[in-house]
């Protein structure tokens, strides 16, 4: 039987279901199992897995080393340069206190699974289709591996809080939930900001959306009360975390390096600007997100929920611009923009899927279900995702080859340093990765 699809929110329609019904989503057990399976497979590819250590890039090794040094009394931001959130490094440090970084696989799995569940819900709200939702969720996981192979990036741990909050905003606009629930919203905001300060863009755009919604509905006082609830929720977390940061005397360093630095210095390396720009544009095109953004721009005036779609598009554009001008060859810079771009793309994929079903429902199809969604996604984006996959594999092979080639030298240097320097000594190493630091477990000078 052909799945009965309703038209997506990006296109105006009269006989729409009640919005409260659109948010009353009951996931099938098969969909939950699929997301669980995707999360497990993605987690097994994390660099916290000892078998994949050689695949770690400079940022991943630096993050693990920063967490390790917290167990040695060396504090991020003041003693070690760091741009991730305080709770992010604390979590890594706790894993080392428990004996191994392998404990981080549990954190990575939870992040993947919760992100997958709420990404599915968001797509289902747009598509009102089980097949489109699970198909786009599969693409979401594939792109997470392609762009952020090895995981362990702060944005991947903060993403569950962002997607839960986005779902919260949708339910607020649709179901008119109680204002006190914004305390929970504030808690989510605080956790995400202390894991990855880059999420500040999402929260600022959310504030604009809520303000615009309340002004449009002439509920300014109610909006102010909601704001107070958000602040109260944030204080519950910020006060606790801030207490430890204050005792460590790193609040000013944290604001400077974790908050101001990422938004004032887009260039992360001194690589060729034109070459890095070309690579990041390939990422933008290959992710399929530009396909969704272009469709949104073309049908913007027809959109049923312009404010909500504008909100998602705005966040995507800001994060995409930051990635394009990162002046770096690594692909992980596009991770913050990925879910928002795919949400825009899912709108167009839903329409194309409905056309295919309507045209071919009387014939037996070679593709069905998730494979049909992936097939539509790849073909309608002119096979550019395959180019992105090839680029990702090529960069991974190149970086791994370099790491393996230099691994013996790094091990020899690490062995020499551990025999010549006491445990409290400090070293300075000029290298692209922090492997020597991690292997010696010595503090950085």
Regions found by a protein language model. Name each.
Residues 180-199, 203-208, 318-323:
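Membrane-interface alpha helices of multi-pass inner-membrane proteins
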């Amino acid at each position: 039987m052909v799945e009965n699809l309703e038209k997506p929110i990006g296109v105006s329609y009269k006989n729409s279901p009640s919005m409260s019904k659109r948010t009353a989503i009951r996931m099938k057990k098969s969909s939950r199992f699929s997301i669980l399976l995707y999360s497990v497979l993605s987690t097994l590819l994390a660099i916290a897995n000892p078998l994949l250590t050689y695949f770690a890039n400079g940022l991943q090794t630096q993050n693990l080393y920063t967490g390790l040094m917290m167990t040695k009394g060396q504090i991020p931001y003041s003693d070690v340069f760091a741009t991730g959130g305080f709770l992010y490094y604390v979590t890594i440090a706790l894993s080392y206190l428990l004996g191994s970084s392998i404990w981080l696989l549990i954190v990575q799995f939870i992040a993947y699974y919760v992100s997958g569940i709420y990404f599915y819900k968001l797509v289902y709200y747009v598509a009102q289709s089980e097949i489109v939702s699970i198909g786009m969720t599969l693409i979401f996981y594939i792109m997470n591996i392609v762009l952020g192979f090895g995981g362990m990036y702060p944005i991947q741990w903060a993403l569950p809080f962002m997607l839960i909050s986005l779902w919260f905003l949708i339910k607020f606009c649709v179901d008119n939930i109680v204002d006190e629930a914004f305390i929970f919203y504030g808690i989510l905001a605080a956790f995400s900001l202390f894991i990855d300060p880059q999420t500040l863009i999402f929260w600022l755009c959310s504030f604009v959306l809520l303000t615009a919604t309340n002004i449009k509905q002439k509920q300014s006082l109610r909006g102010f009360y909601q704001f107070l609830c958000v602040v109260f929720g944030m204080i519950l977390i910020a006060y606790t975390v801030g207490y430890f940061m204050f005792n460590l005397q790193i609040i000013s360093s944290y604001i400077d390096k974790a908050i101001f630095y990422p938004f004032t210095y887009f260039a992360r390396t001194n690589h060729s600007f034109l070459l890095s720009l070309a690579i990041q544009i390939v990422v933008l095109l290959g992710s399929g997100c530009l396909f969704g953004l272009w469709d949104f721009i073309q049908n913007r005036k027809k959109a049923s929920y312009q404010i909500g779609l504008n909100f998602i598009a705005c966040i995507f554009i800001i994060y995409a611009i930051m990635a394009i001008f990162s002046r770096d060859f690594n692909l992980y810079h596009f991770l913050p923009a990925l879910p928002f771009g795919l949400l825009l793309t899912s709108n167009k994929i839903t329409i194309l899927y409905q056309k295919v079903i309507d045209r071919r429902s009387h014939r037996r199809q070679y593709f069905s279900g998730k494979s049909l969604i992936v097939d539509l996604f790849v073909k309608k984006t002119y096979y550019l995702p395959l180019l992105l996959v090839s680029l990702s594999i090529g960069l991974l092979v190149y970086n791994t080859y370099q790491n393996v080639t230099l691994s013996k030298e790094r091990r020899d240097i690490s062995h020499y340093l551990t025999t010549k320097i006491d445990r409290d000594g400090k070293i300075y190493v000029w290298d692209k990765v922090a492997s020597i630091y991690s292997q010696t477990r010595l503090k950085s000078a």
